UniProtKB/Swiss-Prot annotation:
Family (UniProt): Belongs to the UPF0738 family.
InterPro entries in the record: UPF0738
Protein name: UPF0738 protein SAOUHSC_00941
Organism listed in the record: Staphylococcus aureus (strain NCTC 8325 / PS 47)
Taxonomic superkingdom: Bacteria
Amino acid sequence: MRLYINEIKIKDDILYCYTEDSIKGLSEVGQMLVDSDNYAFAYTLDDGKAYAYLIFVQETWTMLHENMTKKIIINDELELTEFHQELTYILDNIKGNNNYGKEFVATVEETFDIE
């Protein structure tokens, strides 16, 4: 199941991310995947039976970059404690790695100020 983040708000130094779908019963796996074809990052969640993926499309990346030190909470109920570590790992892997596609890499490097 793909759960698209469609709204992000900042309040009290916390990044609140919202999806239209329920996340009840889901917990974080602590793994970030890349969907370079669709310019998205997918953060893995689990309900004990199947995985679900929180999709952060390109339009959300600037907010993620500008708020890398803030706590992230999904739908006011699930804190993603390993999100920043996973995103940083993925960004380090993408840097200069054209296996993801030159245009995708260039977009990520520009958005996240990667040199």
